[in-house]
């Protein structure tokens, strides 16, 4: 499981997010896999679209959430998790 340490999260606003929040890109196969899982399990989640084409994943804001600059990212009540397979295991 890839859960970021609190000290790794530089975009502090996400530490206050409540519920299941997914940062994703519509064309990312890993994001698509996670969205399918969430819908199959009927898990309610809030969408935060990250435009990879425009390079949003390399913005200071996004890198402050995930220093690897990849999607999807799960923020669950302020805890940040990355890597789609690990996120699915965590939520299942």
List each language-model region with its residue ranges.
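GST-like domain detector, emphasizing the conserved glutathione-binding G-site
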Residues: 1-92
